[in-house]
A protein has these predicted regions:
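Short hydrophobic/Thr-rich beta-strand motif most characteristic of the beta2 strand and flanking loop
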Residues: 32-40
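Conserved phosphotransfer microenvironments
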Residues: 55-75
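C-terminal output helix
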Residues: 111-120
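Conserved acidic segment of CheY-like receiver
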Residues: 4-25, 57
């Protein structure tokens, strides 16, 4: 049975959100179908996290003025029910920052569709479906 999961894409740049959506695709695994909601600003991101039942957050670590690493850290500190977080970073050397932010996974620009799909499938399949 295929589950539909909701993923938040956060970046201040529409082209980055489009690249993230394209790399993930709508079916990262045979049993997963994704739908996306987009956030172009920090305020919109936080509002959508509060409004939607999200299954995964994909945050751009390079977003301005609030980067995905800071948003991830804030959500981890302030929410007990935070969904899994994947942060996209520009340099592999910054993985330690992503770990400190509380991100469950990191991806590095440019996004590889195979790695991105596998990462998403792993994060979503380990998360229990809402009852």
């Amino acid at each position: 049975m295929t589950q539909t999961q909701t993923v938040l894409l956060y970046s201040d740049k529409a082209e980055i959100r489009d690249r993230m959506r394209l790399a993930v695709g709508t079916r990262p695994a045979p049993d997963l179908t994704l739908q996306f909601v987009d956030a172009a600003s920090y305020r919109e991101c936080i509002s959508l996290v509060d409004t939607y039942e999200l299954d995964l957050l994909l945050l751009d670590g390079e977003a301005q003025p609030a980067g995905g690493l800071g948003v991830a850290r804030q959500l981890r500190d302030e929410r007990d029910d935070c969904p899994p977080i994947c942060v996209v970073i520009a340099r592999a050397a910054d993985r330690w920052l992503a770990a400190y932010s509380g991100a469950d996974a990191t991806l590095v620009h440019p996004l590889d569709p195979v790695t991105t799909g596998q990462t998403f499938a792993g994060l979503l399949q380990r998360t229990p479906a809402p009852s």
